[in-house]
Amino acid sequence: MCQSPLHDFLHGLPKCEHHVHLEGCVTPELIFQLAEKNNIQLPNPATHPAYASVEALRARYAEFTSLNDFLDFYFHGMSVLHHQSDFEELAWAYFQKAHADGVHHAEVFFDPQVHQARGIDYETVVSGFTAGCKRAERELGLSTRLILCFVRHLPVDSATKLYELALASNHFESRVVHGLGWSSSEVGPPKDMFREIYASASGKGIRLTAHAGEEGDPTYISTALELGARRIDHGIRLVEDPELMERVAREGIMLTVCPLSNVRLRCVQSVEQVPIRKFLDAGVKFSINSDDPAYFGGYILDNYCAVQEAFQLSILEWRVIAENSVNESWIDEARKAELLKRIDDHVQKHTVVA
């Protein structure tokens, strides 16, 4: 529970989430439930004790040693998803939680390559997640966007085939998929491994983002920008390059910061080391997000509260964060105006009370 006096303000503050992986919302309970339903053999507890029980798995999530350590569990976790209904159920579970945390707009990543590699059709994944998005829009009043995310640990050829399949399915023009991103292992694979895909997508007007500057140094960020990304996911190591940070601020490039994820994956030792204050002072736009909440022990409100407890931000500083989150969302001007009005109303209410 958030200990900040601003908890009620933060809970009710209209939020936009830009960095959450739907596959990162598979809770330990859902992993065991779907494994039984779909007759999936989880790793043997004799050699992988974390899979002895729901409780053991959740406890292991608190002990990740690195990004790659987490990714091993992440990819095991998504292996239980087999049917369209599984993907829809997962998305719907996330949207319900996000809505309860005050999210009004959500842009969510999904990882088709990994599912394809285990024999799941692309259309099964997309149709399931799309159904979850539509239900959230219909029943919760959220606006949603799907971002197709390439993974850096698989060959570029598989990403190219996936991109061509999405194009052939007319998923970008029909707004089933609203953009492209990349994630997974940052350090190791070539920084520019998706250069040709991003060049093609940029030429077609497809929105681009990229995970960079989480474990990798600032050159990973500059490479992503060179390839056409207009949003950077994580990006906390941007502070190591003042010149690049000034460019990011000047060009209005938003970072999608995930504080609790950074702590769990040992990119920083504590939330206090996430450069929130430095970004605010430098005029760098950022949103605050949950990343893989089932694995990192917190959804978006938990991240907001952790930031508040670490930095003691003012209501007006939170207003800047919330408004930047809206203005840099992939939504039309009418929706932006609607959300900005909700933020203004909320701030005015709490400012008067204060």
Curated annotation (Swiss-Prot):
GO CC annotation terms, alphabetical: cytoplasm; nucleus
Site (Important for catalytic activity): 234
InterPro entries registered for this protein in UniProt: A/AMP_deam_AS (IPR006650), A_deaminase_dom (IPR001365), ADE (IPR028892), Ado/ade_deaminase (IPR006330), Metal_Hydrolase (IPR032466)
Cofactor: Zn(2+)
Amino acids binding Zn(2+): 19, 21, 211, 291
GO biological process per UniProt: adenine catabolic process; hypoxanthine salvage; nucleotide metabolic process; purine ribonucleoside monophosphate biosynthetic process
Subcellular location: Cytoplasm; Nucleus
Enzyme Commission numbers on file: 3.5.4.2
One of the record's GO molecular function terms: zinc ion binding
Residues holding substrate: 292
Catalytic activity: adenine + H2O + H(+) = hypoxanthine + NH4(+)
Record note on cofactor: Binds 1 zinc ion per subunit.
Active site, UniProt feature: 214
Family recorded in the similarity comment: Belongs to the metallo-dependent hydrolases superfamily. Adenosine and AMP deaminases family. Adenine deaminase type 2 subfamily.
Function: Catalyzes the hydrolytic deamination of adenine to hypoxanthine. Plays an important role in the purine salvage pathway and in nitrogen catabolism.
UniProt protein name: Adenine deaminase
Natural source organism: Aspergillus fumigatus (strain ATCC MYA-4609 / CBS 101355 / FGSC A1100 / Af293)
Organism ancestry: Eukaryota, Fungi, Dikarya, Ascomycota, Pezizomycotina
